[in-house]
Amino acid sequence: VPPGFTPFR
């Protein structure tokens, strides 16, 4: 995954 990307918030 790209830095700073999160599938969970």
From Swiss-Prot:
| Similarity comment: family membership | Belongs to the bradykinin-related peptide family.
What is the protein's name according to its record?
A: [Val1,Thr6]-bradykinin
Q: Which GO terms describe its cellular component?
A: extracellular region
Indicate where this protein is primarily found: secreted
Record-level GO BP terms: defense response
On tissue specificity, the annotation reads:
Expressed by the skin glands.
Subcellular location, in the record's words?
Secreted
Instruction: Recite the UniProt keywords alphabetically.
Output: Amphibian defense peptide, Bradykinin receptor impairing toxin, G-protein coupled receptor impairing toxin, Secreted, Toxin
* Entry's Gene Ontology molecular function annotations: toxin activity
